[in-house]
Amino acid sequence: MRYIRRIELNKVRYIEVDMLKALCIVCMIFNHVYEELAADPGGPYVFFDLSSTFLGAASFMLCMGIGMRLARHQEPKEYAVRGFELLTVGQLLNIFRSALPALIGYAMTGRSYFLSNVMLVFQADILTFAGLAFLFVALLKKAHVSDRWMVVIALAMNILNYVLYLTVEPPSNFLVSQFMGFFIVTDAESFFSLSAYFVFVAIGYWIGGIYPDIKDRKAAAYKVLMVGLPAIVIYYAIRINVAIPFYPEFNSDEQYIVNQGTDALANTMVAIAVLAVFCLISDRLGERAKAVTEHLSRNINQYYCVSYMLIMPLLTIMLAIREEYMPGWVIPTLYAVFVLIATNGIIVLNDRYVHFHVVTLKGRMRRVVFALIWVVSVIVVIYTYPRITEYATVWNGYLLP
């Protein structure tokens, strides 16, 4: 009976989870515009930068774990298929977001940093991470690992990743380092390595397993806030003001990438606290607001991909023509608003009239398109790798001026 009840409950959407994902989408778009296109965005960027530090990818991944656990499709094979789909979509995004604009910039200017950025056709981005996470969960489910043990394994992976980061020199070969960067933090583009970030998915997966059985979610939310808020305040008061040995500087790229144990748990506490707040206020949302929130949540991957396609090609144009970024904060803020509105419009128009989604392709067309995406990616690397001596990564600012 419990199994039947769980399947029925899986048909229910939890508006607080949708609200958290929607908040992350909005913050993500503004943050990406400021970071990629603005020279010195100032005031507004401080808020979105801190939102990235305290919530950021952690909330995305926590919600992803919750969604995985509550999904109707629970067979390991279904998880594996979804994982490969996400890897392929991420690879398609890398081609059009990174490789193609950089190749065009190199053809226009001959500047070496453009060619170096072409190698970002393979990078440990968040969609790549999501694909690997689904594949890893498929393996764990095949091995009949329980939800709690999944959390234990994830914490062990996170700790091991940080120890390796502090003690082991990365490989001298960039391609090897990049491949390893999908799994552990290296000196390549390992922004979201599986070992560093899987802890959020695992905790979300565990929460998703118990969430439908919580009879009074509002009462539970109050308890979470009563315990969680003091713990969050105490932790970050220490983290911000005390130099802790072996810890990355607070709010640095290193902290975000390495995502070591206690920082990861603190991010998780913040995400759960925000989820609790949204649970308490969700009844006050009107039907229109709920519809918008659900739309953002359902299309989270599309918002990620489409918004990036309105950001990165513009960066290439700006650098190729004048090697300058947007001045101040007003123009970047207006452009971020435009990106949010335009992304929504593109997604709505596609859903109403075009109905094109790579992952919904069937049969031979699906096999051909998926294979083409991976073949093109490999060809890009074969062309680029022998022609460069420096490799663009987050650690060197992507070699950009």
Task: For each feature predicted by the language model, list its residue ranges.
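Alpha-helical transmembrane segments and their immediate juxtamembrane cytosolic regions
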Residues: 1-401
